[in-house]
Swiss-Prot record:
This is Japanin. Does not bind to any major populations in peripheral blood mononuclear, including monocytes, B cells, T cells and NK cells, as well as to other blood DC (not differentiated from monocytes). The keyword Disulfide bond applies. Residues 1-24 form the signal peptide. It comes from Rhipicephalus appendiculatus (Brown ear tick). It comes from the Eukaryota. Cholesterol binds at residue 47. Each monomer contains a pocket that accomodates cholesterol. Cholesterol derivatives (such as epicholesterol, epicholestanol, epicoprostenol, or 7-dehydrocholesterol) could also fit in the pocket with minor rearrangement of the side chain. Since arthropods are unable to synthesize cholesterol de novo, it is likely that a cholesterol ligand would be bloodmeal-derived.
């Protein structure tokens, strides 16, 4: 009887671990279908009069996901001028790198790079940085779930890792 209990207990532990590992792995937001909003960045990445930055899923071809980068030139007068450009991303599961193929427009005008280091991510946020150095410029992207209030742990990581972090408040006028 004790052997049977031991076997049942062992089976339960193994199943629990497998279930936890399967359910516990977060989805990479850069390659799923959710829209991501720029929630913060290093001050070196600041572009005057550029706001309302978001990226939207378009499609997937093989391992590459195509996304649009949408932003507006904000001025004192309206209407604002909306701009958009396409880029592709690829992520190998558990890799620390996010590969990017940007259009000429996105690369030349917004400084997109071919690789970004994934500092941390979860189903609803993504913190990216350049590969150059330990405290390199970075950007924080979140889903709609976190646009109004970024959880403290994510915020703390953003402020610790990113040099001269600048939060980007969510502006209702951007996303009617």
């Amino acid at each position: 009887m004790k052997v049977l209990r031991c076997l049942v207990c062992s089976f339960y532990i193994i199943v629990s671990l497998i279930t936890t590992m399967t359910i516990g792995t977060p989805s990479m937001p850069a390659i799923n279908t959710q829209t991501l909003y720029l929630a913060g960045h290093s001050s070196k990445l600041f572009e005057r009069n550029v706001g309302c930055v978001k990226t939207r899923y378009l499609n997937q071809t093989g391992d590459w996901v195509t996304r649009s980068l949408i932003y507006v030139f904000t001025f004192d007068t309206e209407p604002w001028v909306t701009q958009a450009g396409a880029f592709q991303v690829k992520w190998e599961p558990y890799s620390p790198l996010l590969r990017v193929k940007a259009s000429d427009y996105v690369r030349d005008n917004l400084g997109a790079k071919p690789d970004y280091f994934i500092r941390t991510y979860d189903n609803d946020f993504l913190l990216l940085s350049d590969l150059k150095e330990v405290r390199s410029t970075c950007s924080l992207w979140v889903t709609l779930k976190y646009v109004d209030r970024i959880p403290e742990t994510i915020n703390r990581t953003f402020y610790t890792i990113c040099p001269d972090p600048v939060p980007v408040p969510f502006d209702e006028r951007c996303y009617p």
